[in-house]
Amino acid sequence: MPILNLTPDELLSTTRSVRKRLDLTRPVEPELVRECLELALQAPTGSNTQSWQFVVVTDPEKRMAISELYRQSWTAYRATPQRAARTYTDPTERRQTMKRVIDSSEYLAEHLHEVPVHLIPCITGRLDHLSTTIMQAGAWGSILPAVWSFMLAARSRGLGTTWTTLHLAYEREAADVLGIPYDKITQCALIPVAYTLGTNFSPAPREPLDSVLHWDKW
């Protein structure tokens, strides 16, 4: 797959959360996943610990098992009052956007097992005991840049991704499916990876910068 002709600004502004436009019928070459992960390893990591691990899941039975855990969590999340409140009480424009997000999330939950590659980024050690903000920030700051780098590399190669965490409600069960040593490794997310249906993605609507910008003081 040739690299898409995107400027750095275009790459950063058009790497979207892709759900409905994932090509569920086209295999993803293992070497392409490796290329993206090689680039991900260049991301910064706290104290250069490089405490990341990446589990790539392509086996259909294991993808189905992980997807069933994801669907159980999605069903529970969909029924929460907080989710309903966000859907129905936001201003009209945001409500419409939220409906599209929920619809695409529903689609992903139904079809996750068909996505050819599941990437599960992990951190060495358990994060459950991290009680201070500085420790939590350090841990997540050592994996999120790498995953975002992976997503950017994937986008530039015609692949779509999205950050999901719902399967973590059943992290131990997922660890059993994949042979991950639960007591020593923390799963951080599940990234579906597939070719996209078309490569024409646009910048997303966002609130004006000045509504969230604080300069020198709040």
Q: Which stretches of residues belong to each language-model region?
A:
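Short loop-to-beta-strand entry elements in the cores of soluble alpha/beta enzymes
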Residues: 47-58
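Glycine-rich, charged/polar anion/phosphate-binding loops
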Residues: 39-41, 102-106, 174-178, 198-199
